[in-house]
Structure formats: structure tokens, C-alpha cells
């Protein structure tokens, strides 16, 4: 018998192997009335691309837009890294920003653990996003900058961190979700997303998606 996919987890875009005792989030967060500040181990999946409709399409093994996930070996599932994160909200607006070590890790060895900070070798990675919620809709615009370039081979595989070069690049994105129908506990929402990376030699430099959920 032929099957569509080898593993049930594949239907949820979960393709990574099991990792024992890997740290996803570990740190200290201080909370004010309209703001949060966090320092410690964290990954991008905690704070970005987690809105209601988008989370149905992402947050598995890809986790975030491919213009970022396929371009940099960052703290994206199943990897994490040392992070300084904050967000501020007022009215329907929220601004959030995260500063990470340029490479994510999930091991427990001396040279592979999420507590490493090596800006000269791994680079620095920063993500910023502005969000607006109004009348059943959520709208987002953001940008990410990495201080090192990770090329790809002819097979599309990303180079190792030791082979990266000192060349900054950025990715930007806009996306929105809007409820178009609601009755009792059921609703339908439409989604549109677009993103580009400034370096066309990265794993993915342009991405777009339309969806209904």
C-alpha cells in the first residue's frame, strides 16, 4: 500500500527528530502593565508568526517564513539561543523586538549549547515587528537583520556556520488576517502574506501565501 506521508506528525509539519532535554525557553521575564522584558534562552517561535491563522500553517518544523528560516541557522525550532526580548503594547498596537546570537543550538556540549554567545563567529540576529489589531483583523509588518551570510550549495543545503561570510542581509515581511464570517463558535478568516530577503543567494529570497481557515 502506498501512503501519502510516512509519519502522522508530517501532517502537522513536524519533521524534526526527537531531542532529549533540549531547552526551548529558560530565563527571566519582567512584566509591566503594557510591556514585557525577557533575558535568557528563547526561540523565535515564541513571539513571531504565532497569530491565529498563521499558526495553523507554520510553527512546525519550518516555524517561520522561509525567507528567514531557509536563510539563517537561527534559534528557530528545534534550536534556541540566548535572547534579549521586549514588547510594548498600546491600544491596538504592539511592537516587539528580539536580539539573538546569530546561530541557534540545542545540544549540551561545549561547542553546541543554547547559552553560547559568539557574535564574531555566529553573527548577531535581530527581529522587529509592529502589529495592529482592529475589528476582527490582525495586521503585521516586520524586518530581520543578520550580520553574516550563509550561502547554499547546488543542492540547496545551507553552508555550515564556519563557512559563513561577514556580509549583512535582511528580510522583511507583511501579512494580515481578517475574519470574514462568524456564527456562534465558528468563524472563517482570510490570510495574505508576503516576504522578501535582500540577498538572492540565500536559501529563499521571496515568499507569498494566501489562505483561508
Where would I find each of the regions flagged by the language model?
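Membrane-embedded beta-strand positions of outer-membrane beta-barrel proteins
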Residues: 37-39, 86, 95-97, 139-143, ...
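Surface-exposed extracellular loop regions of Gram-negative outer-membrane beta-barrel proteins
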Residues: 171, 175-195
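Short loop/turn motifs that connect adjacent beta-strands in outer-membrane beta-barrel proteins
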Residues: 33-34, 89-92, 133-139, 181-188
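Solvent-exposed loop/turn segments connecting transmembrane beta-strands
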Residues: 166-167, 196-207
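Outer-membrane beta-barrel pore domains and translocons
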Residues: 1, 42-44, 100-102, 144-148, ...
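Surface-exposed beta-loop-beta
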Residues: 103-175
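Outer membrane beta-barrel
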Residues: 1-102, 132, 202-209
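Flexible, solvent-exposed coil segments and beta strand-coil junctions
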Residues: 2-11, 60-68, 103-112, 151-158, ...
Amino acid at each position: 500500500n502506498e501512503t501519502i506521508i510516512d509519519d502522522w506528525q508530517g501532517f502537522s509539519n513536524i519533521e524534526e527528530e526527537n531531542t532529549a532535554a533540549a531547552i526551548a525557553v529558560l530565563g527571566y521575564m519582567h512584566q509591566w502593565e503594557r510591556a514585557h522584558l525577557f533575558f535568557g534562552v528563547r526561540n523565535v517561535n515564541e513571539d513571531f508568526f504565532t497569530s491565529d491563522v498563521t499558526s495553523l500553517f507554520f510553527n512546525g518544523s519550518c516555524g517561520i517564513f522561509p525567507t528567514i528560516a531557509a536563510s539563517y541557522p537561527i534559534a528557530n525550532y528545534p534550536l534556541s539561543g540566548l535572547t534579549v526580548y521586549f514588547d510594548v503594547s498600546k491600544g491596538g498596537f504592539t511592537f516587539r523586538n528580539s536580539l539573538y546570537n546569530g546561530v541557534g543550538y540545542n545540544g549540551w556540549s561545549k561547542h553546541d549549547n543554547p547559552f553560547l554567545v559568539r557574535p564574531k563567529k555566529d553573527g548577531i540576529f535581530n527581529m522587529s515587528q509592529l502589529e495592529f489589531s482592529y475589528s476582527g483583523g490582525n495586521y503585521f509588518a516586520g524586518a530581520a537583520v543578520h550580520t553574516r551570510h550563509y550561502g547554499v550549495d547546488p543542492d540547496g543545503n545551507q553552508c555550515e556556520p564556519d563557512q559563513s561570510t561577514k556580509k549583512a542581509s535582511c528580510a522583511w515581511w507583511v501579512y494580515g488576517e481578517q475574519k470574514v464570517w462568524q456564527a456562534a463558535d465558528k468563524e472563517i478568516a482570510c490570510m495574505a502574506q508576503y516576504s522578501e530577503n535582500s540577498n538572492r543567494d540565500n536559501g529563499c529570497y521571496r515568499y507569498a501565501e494566501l489562505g483561508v481557515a
